[in-house]
């Protein structure tokens, strides 16, 4: 099947927001108005098209980013619905990596919320151009202008209004289009499918003129000719203004702001027009960087069908009907069923079996995919999230994704031998699907340990194990992922000697072991000159050091942020071996950790509590009792917002405590911020418990 749309007519975009801002509802309306969905699904009755996992429909939150394709105004939209809950940040990060643009949905009542800040930062990291949709304008307390201010205050964005609301709360009727200077009004009885232009209401004419001037001034600033004409009193026409706004969005100079109520079917079609008019195509985003597989030099791939095939796998899912499916973005070249590709990340060959175009939860078989497409592949053997699939003759490794370390863990014990077998298969599939979910075995107890980004993250994984994979298991209480490090420099000189008749073992190593910069992890370097330790034994030295990192000397937690320099050593012509140096390095490193003033580190969470004013005192008192440090508080609407840094160890079960003393009226979000040294009195308790 030949290409149906030119690559410049593609819009690969995601919808990102805080939980409950109305992201999935907005996507549902987009699918409805573009003709992909014959009935509108509502999140609150568990029928939304994009939320297709049972866990999502029950909880009313989006967990996995489902990709779907739709057509609007002759353009092909590939939409990725991303989760807004902080425990699923990894999903957002993955989808932003493969998007060209994004729509940031705000709750008209709440404005910029904690997860909005997180997603905005992630979009900055990947340089994703974005437009803003202020949703829920029909809600009590909705305030469009406050939301616009919050974009500046909270995320240092540069919002420029392209629309203004007509009315708010129950009287929200439509929007003023500042580009065309018309009022757009929706007809309630037609499920939002019908709307018409009117003249701008007289009471809003001055405000519309004021914001129109701001829009035009922001737009013409980016173009010398338009600026000159504007200063001469010539305003840009509609087509020119649109092209200037597009230029500003693609260059990330400002963020156009639109408004509506997806639930009340108002504002969605102009938002779709804005996606088409202002968000970039793959051509606008330009070449993607990569590393040449053979030479390891930097290279690029242009978004063109004529380039060598270069594809990035950004999500793996286990589908009950098709098996494992891999969501991919074709960055360059074209891909056909039956084609042989190289997984350059793992240096393994793969063959493209079945290729699917996904629409939320139904799928369409296709034979070819072209540059710019987002498709799902079934039947790949060994592909993980972030892997590159490419033409073996011109292999490339595209930029890798970065995944956060888990901060919370639970032990899981299958109830029977049959469960044990099912658990192994299920966990390997879940870990392949989600790189922020890790599985390990506790060496001492033999228990299987699940690690994740938060309580909800692990709750849902356990739920999937029980429902989808029918694994019956006992689940332990959540544990904190502590770390260990050292606080002072130590020089260690260690000799390993063993003589048992025949060839013995001999190795001497001398290290300088010192604290590394926070977050830099473990670093090993060899400063050996003159062959005191022969080159062939250096890998043995490194292996010995790395074998200690998994279990520190205080309570057996992983060791982080330590720098080790090999400065001297000695070897024996006959008795030395890589194994001898491995043993010597292991013992030397453990000694250095013990003598380097070791400390425990714990994850500190950034906590935001939104509470009615009556409960603010209780919230602050409770957070203080949890070793929290209050960072500040401000008002959001008529609610008080308390920001604090609190150790994760003290946040278990917080949701129930908060619910009980606020009668369910206060809410909170938390996300990992950094690791910090555990106070000595608490450290003693932790060591007593784990050592």
Curated annotation (Swiss-Prot):
Q: What is its main location?
A: cytoplasm
GO MF, one term, reads: translation elongation factor activity
List UniProt keywords, sorted A-Z.
Cytoplasm, Elongation factor, GTP-binding, Nucleotide-binding, Protein biosynthesis
Q: Where does GTP bind?
A: 17-24, 81-85, 135-138
Pfam families given for it?
EFG_C, EFG_III, EFG_IV, GTP_EFTU, GTP_EFTU_D2
From the Swiss-Prot or TrEMBL record, state where the protein is found.
Cytoplasm
Q: Could you confirm whether the keyword Nucleotide-binding appears in this record? A: yes
> Which Gene Ontology biological process is one annotated for this entry?
ribosome disassembly
What InterPro entries does the annotation carry?
EFG_II, EFG_III, EFG_III/V, EFG_IV, EFG_V, EFG_V-like, EFTu-like_2, G_TR_CS
Q: Where is the tr-type G domain?
A: 8-283
List the GO terms this entry assigns under cellular component, sorted alphabetically: cytoplasm
SUPFAM superfamilies linked: EF-G C-terminal domain-like, P-loop containing nucleoside triphosphate hydrolases, Ribosomal protein S5 domain 2-like, Translation proteins
Q: Which family does it belong to?
A: Belongs to the TRAFAC class translation factor GTPase superfamily. Classic translation factor GTPase family. EF-G/EF-2 subfamily.
Stated role = Catalyzes the GTP-dependent ribosomal translocation step during translation elongation. During this step, the ribosome changes from the pre-translocational (PRE) to the post-translocational (POST) state as the newly formed A-site-bound peptidyl-tRNA and P-site-bound deacylated tRNA move to the P and E sites, respectively. Catalyzes the coordinated movement of the two tRNA molecules, the mRNA and conformational changes in the ribosome.
This protein is called Elongation factor G
